[in-house]
Amino acid sequence: MIRFAPALAAAATCALATPAFAQQTDVSDPLPTGEEATVFDGDFLSVGVGVGYNPSYSGSDDYNVNVLPIVQGSVWGVDINPRPAGLALDLIPDAAEGVSFSAGPMVRLRNDRVDAEDINDDVVAAYGELDRAVEVGGSVGVKFPQVLNPFDSLSFTLDATWDVAGAHDGRTISPSVTYFTPVSRATAASLSFSTSFVDDDFADYYYSVPATNAALPAEDVLPGFDAEGGMQSYGFNLLLAHDLSGDLTDGGLSLVGIAGWTKLVDDAADSPFTSIRGDNDQYLVALGVGYTF
């Protein structure tokens, strides 16, 4: 299993993410301490709450504030890792030392434009609400420890999901790479780079625009657009986590700050929902607090 600590940090990244910020971050022990016991040695659970400021839909230049619960942990040898509005399970035991692997099932909800009241653009809202997608698939990863110092790691993760709820009926593939390092005994940081690729069904559902719309005056109707699959986005997330007890390894209360930028590309950027009514530069700022035990 691949672990990241404090666990709240990864949970906050994913729980506060919009569809454009489908960032993967897995759990990782913060500081190898030899024989010294840590809260992450056996079963543990992290719970908390986060507040995020993020786009009102994928491609929007209007932003909403969201308050979301956070949960992550390891139970009976199975890591529970957050995904945006979902979870991924890691079923592979950690290697005693050296390279570690992760693999397991995942499920997530996609809530993009499902509620017109959350779309802060009257023109986009006039094109109607979308159905909530339920995406099921799997996640695999590999972690290389001690890259630049004895306590850091470099992780590669790949998520693939398919909608099973009859919303977009499509597929997403999301590779990411994360560098994690403790800054001190109390503070850790990670920098992640991620990309996302979607198929034609996904792109058509979220980014195509019909040529007519009777709900809008003629001057507000957007030009018709037929979106096709391909690369949807790439971006970076920077995360800082600070344990309030001064020791990342003993659990307790932690504070987490996240800043992220995502660039929509290809048809996700060319869609009038983005190019006319929104912006292909998407930003995320989030703060979280939680308790690990």
What are these regions (language model features)?
Residues V47-P55, V78-L89, V123-A125, S153-V164:
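Transmembrane beta-strand segments that form the barrel wall of outer-membrane beta-barrel proteins
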Residues V142-Q146, V164-S174, T178-S254, W261-A269, ...:
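Outer-membrane beta-barrel transmembrane domain signature
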Residues D43-V49, P69, I80, F101-P105, ...:
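Transmembrane beta-strands of outer-membrane beta-barrel proteins
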Residues V49-Y53, P69-V75, L87-P93, P105, ...:
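Residues on the lipid-exposed face of transmembrane beta-strands in outer-membrane beta-barrel proteins
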Residues V51-N54, I119-V124, L158-A160, L216-F225, ...:
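Extracytoplasmic loops and strand-loop junctions of Gram-negative outer membrane beta-barrel proteins
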Residues P32-D43, G59, V78-F101, P145-S153, ...:
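Short loop/turn motifs that connect adjacent beta-strands in outer-membrane beta-barrel proteins
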Residues M1-F40, S60:
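Cleavable N-terminal export/targeting peptides
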Residues D43, Y63-P69, V99, L130-V136, ...:
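Residues that define the transmembrane beta-barrel architecture of outer-membrane proteins
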